[in-house]
Design a protein with these regions (language model features):
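Beta-strand elements of repeat-based all-beta scaffolds
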Residues: 1-126
Length: 126
């Protein structure tokens, strides 16, 4: 049980971008550079882990909840990952839920629609 504070590593967290109209750029997903985010690792009394990545404005950009017994230390394997995307005024614009993150990582989503800031595929709600 406890809390650890670390920094992110290169290639660990997607840095989602918005275009000039505030729409999510789905064709470009660079990563945050090493040390750009604070990585807060919380372990509960049962040994379950939650990892939050916060930017310099203290906004949570990624929250990973342990989904398997032995999740990978870095990346998304074994985690239920949720991304939070903010506009230039720090307003939360999009939430990418765990199932959508899985489909994105598998390459199964090439286009998005959104409804109320939640990402949808063109034919299925994720």
């Amino acid at each position: 049980m406890g809390i650890e504070y670390k920094l992110n590593k290169d290639g660990e967290v997607f840095k989602w971008l918005l275009d000039s109209l505030g729409e999510l750029k789905t064709n470009s997903r660079p990563y945050y550079r090493s040390g750009e985010l604070t990585r807060i690792i919380t372990t509960d009394e049962h040994g379950h882990i939650v990892v939050e990545y916060k930017d310099k404005q203290q906004r949570v950009v990624l929250k990973k909840v342990q989904a398997e017994a032995n999740p990978a230390e870095y990346g998304h394997t074994g985690w239920a990952s949720t991304y939070y995307i903010y506009d230039q005024y720090s307003n939360l614009r999009y939430v990418i839920p765990p199932q959508a993150v899985e489909h994105i990582l598998e390459g199964n989503i090439t286009a998005f629609e959104s409804q109320g800031g939640i990402l949808l595929t063109s034919d299925t709600t994720l």
